[in-house]
């Protein structure tokens, strides 16, 4: 039976990069990460070495991600599975103006994606670094669009625990018959 590279990969490179990026986002970097995890900086370095014999526990990565207020680990895991991570704020912190603002951010991000495409194909060839930049812009566009849609559904769709009519804008009532998305004015 053929060997698959992913079967023997105990700690993928994308995971190590995401952990390093998460640590770098902390104000005091590795020193702060070591404090959060109650380990030495060397313990961190040892677990992030290429071809090392130790692994960096996912639980540690999640602690550091929360401490830094980032989602680099979640993004990396989602991308490794050909998916998109969508971070959502608490619904209590979101109103119609926030949803509209997020839609404007989506449009701006799609503009950035479009500019990246134009720049990359200008010479007729998409170089590897350009492909990476395009994929980064595409990922951000998809993520922001999914975030917008999820917020719309979360606020305006009826769920078992929440009546969307309580959250709707004045003059807008979520349709009880539809269960999601349609409005009655």
Curated annotation (Swiss-Prot):
Any one GO molecular function term: DNA binding
Organism domain of life: Bacteria
Q: Which Pfam families match?
A: Phage_CP76
The record ties this protein, via InterPro entries, to: Phage_186_CII-like, YmfL-like
Question: What protein is this chain from?
Answer: Uncharacterized protein YmfL
* Naturally occurring in which organism (per UniProt): Escherichia coli (strain K12)
**Organism classification, top ranks?**
Bacteria, Pseudomonadati, Pseudomonadota, Gammaproteobacteria, Enterobacterales
